[in-house]
Design a protein with these regions (language model features):
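Acidic, surface-exposed loops and disordered segments
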Residues: 1-312
């Protein structure tokens, strides 16, 4: 979440790796249950597995080897233990070629539709058990889901402390002074080019006491445009919501994103409506109904897809 990569790696030797959640990078307000952080661990594992195959190695992955996780995760216990084993029979993954290309694109997408055969290719990207993947490009569906996503963003940032946590990791000048390599800047938010410069101008010339409110309005307007420009939406659901489910959802998401990159598609997660914030429950239930997901299942990821002229 927010490009903070909330994990750390312990290399026991050249072939043994332990993956941990990094408690210094967890978002206590944006991601209160560390669900997104576990999904992020899944994306790391999938990337490692793909890269290992390219090197002729088989990745033997054991999730939560120390104990079955219940409730909050103990940062001292590994999320995964990974052993890399040389294997002449391992098959390389064509998605390896897109590891460095794949990135989250938060710009406004074009009006170009996604061909149905591309959607089918994306749907075939999933390979994790107990995980379902869905897509829809139907106009009325997109309009209704866009409304829920935008309303969810308003609920998310109605909490001042939660918005402050967001601003700490998103460098919007002149508000954010965060200079570390994690998070992302204004251009990666989708505020790039002349339009982005003009959008940020009121923040630059306004008194400091007004800037957070102006930034909130700017981010909400941008989120609405982002959602409304989606050529399609995709989602990943699991039957439960155990930590294993969350990691598997992350692996599925990474394969979908890499496959999208290979097809020239842009992708952006839009997951606020999935979070257990106060006031979000009704929107989440309506999204479940819209997606056709039973309330005994959990939507782990929700994302928009489309084509973009910008690399942001």
């Amino acid at each position: 979440p927010l490009n903070i990569q909330p994990w750390s790696v312990l290399c026991k030797d050249s072939c043994r790796i332990d993956l941990y959640l990094d408690k210094r990078r967890l978002l206590s307000l944006m991601d209160p249950g560390s669900r997104q952080a576990c999904i992020s661990c899944g994306t790391f594992i999938e990337n490692l597995d793909i890269a290992a195959r390219e090197a002729g190695l088989r990745a033997e992955i054991s999730l939560f080897p120390s104990s079955w996780p219940v409730g909050d995760i103990d940062p001292g216990q590994p999320v995964a233990e990974i052993v890399l084993v040389p294997d002449l029979g391992v098959v390389s993954d064509p998605l390896f070629a897109w590891l460095e290309t794949r990135h989250t694109n938060r710009s406004i997408y074009t009006n170009d539709p996604i061909p149905s055969d591309i959607i089918s290719i994306l749907a075939d990207a999933a390979n994790q058990p107990f995980t379902t993947l869905g897509f829809s490009a139907e106009p009325s569906f997109r309009q209704e889901l866009s409304t829920h996503i935008t309303d969810a963003m308003e609920i998310t940032f109605s909490d001042r402390d939660r918005f402050s946590e967001f601003l700490f990791h998103v460098r919007i000048p002149p508000i954010s002074a965060h200079q570390y390599s994690d998070g992302y800047g204004a251009s990666e938010t989708g505020l790039d080019g002349v339009r982005g410069w003009l959008s940020l101008l009121p923040l630059r010339i306004s008194p400091a006491g007004l800037r957070n409110g102006l930034a909130r309005g700017l981010i909400l307007r941008l989120a609405r445009k982002q959602a409304e420009s989606a050529a399609a939406f995709g989602w990943i659901a699991t039957k439960g919501s155990s930590r294993h489910d969350q990691v598997r959802a992350g692996r599925t998401y990474e394969r979908v994103h890499l496959t999208a990159a290979s097809a020239g598609l842009s992708l952006q997660p839009m997951t606020c409506v999935l979070e257990p914030y106060s006031g979000m429950g009704d929107h989440y239930r309506r999204v479940l109904d819209l997606l056709g997901i039973p309330d005994t299942h959990t939507v782990q990821m929700l994302f928009r897809l489309g084509y973009s002229h910008s690399s942001s």
